[in-house]
Amino acid sequence: MYIFAFLPIFALLILENMKKTIYLLAALLLLLSSCKSKKNLVSPIARPVLNTDSIRPDSSDVVARLFAPDTSGLKKLSARRKAAEKRQVASSGITRSIPPVVARGTNITSSAVSVSSVYPGIDRVKRYEFTHRDVPEAFDGFRIAFISDLHYKSLFKEKGLESLVRLLNAQHADVLLMGGDYQEGCQFVPELFAALAKVKTPLGTYGVMGNNDYERCHDEIIREMKRYGMRPLEHQLDTLRRNGEQIILAGVRNPFDLANNGVSPTLSLSPADFVILLVHTPDYAEDVSVANSDLVLAGHTHGGQVRIFGYAPIIPSHYGSRFLTGLKYNSAKIPMIVTNGIGTSNKNIRIGAPAEIVMITLHRLRNE
């Protein structure tokens, strides 16, 4: 009747793992065959005890493997997790590199600095160091300020606008790029652009329109931008020149109307040029070919606007969370920086998606 002492172990291992159950049966057969008399048997007691004295020497390895924890799954999980971490740019305050296998000739790092205590209405400055082999020598160290989704007079109001202007001027950017969705009413457009005109950059200010701006106030925004010397880019190109060298800016007109705007303005450019594509939604860079772009700047998602433990229940993208925020890549491995933006839409609330400005510093890749 001693065999009943092992019934709890049978039950446990059958539930746990069929492979281990087979090992257990093999071990028990070895135990039984090694018993030469009754004194070698394990007596039935309240708590079963394995009599290790009765194990043959050649069966010890089987038993050791049987009772050793199976860590193969953990090792595979750890390997997958490390691989995933290498392909991500860090969240706030941490800097990591994107390996060359993702984007040959490109290296990108990021960090974030909280500024809300000094600049009410703006939570942080998200910084990117963008190193690329096609960056001209004259643009090594070139600083780009990028803002989007102001939705002026939503959660973002007069005090936030004043903070934004001060913060942008404190960055000493060489150019200001804007990603659209500027307003929550046409009556606010003149006030908004009069304030943004106070941002001083050597190479000026450029912008595209967002879906809000095509629904209303499009003509008013274009008029106010031109009044202050800003350049709207609606399926247009412009050239930034510095010390005899240049980079190209391309802007997309209404990226939601692919029937009319489904051919990217970058397709006419040379792969040898360094090209920044400015578009309101990151979906456009996946919906159509944006070949010859070296960097895409987009907004629209608001970083989810409300994120609970990283989960955003509402994301205005037909790709879900794929292009939610931060450094992303389209299927062609073209890097995209997607900003959380500043204002809000629908509900005047932000949780887990800090209002931000983006600062990008270009660097020329010296050695691959």
Regions found by a protein language model. Name each.
Residues 123, 132-145, 230-231, 238-250, ...:
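Beta-strand-turn-beta hairpins that frame and shape the catalytic cleft
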Residues 5, 19-25:
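Sec-dependent signal peptide recognition
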Residues 35-143, 154:
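Acidic, histidine-bearing metal-coordination/catalytic regions of metal-dependent phosphoesterases
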Residues 197, 282-361, 365-367:
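Conserved beta-sheet core of the metallophosphoesterase superfamily
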Residues 138-223, 228-231:
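Membrane-embedded segments
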Residues 147-148, 175-181, 204-211, 233-236, ...:
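Active-site neighborhood of phospho(di)ester-bond hydrolases with catalytic His/Asp-centered motifs
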Residues 105-107, 113-117, 129-131, 193-258, ...:
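Extended active-site neighborhood of metal-dependent phosphoesterases/phosphodiesterases
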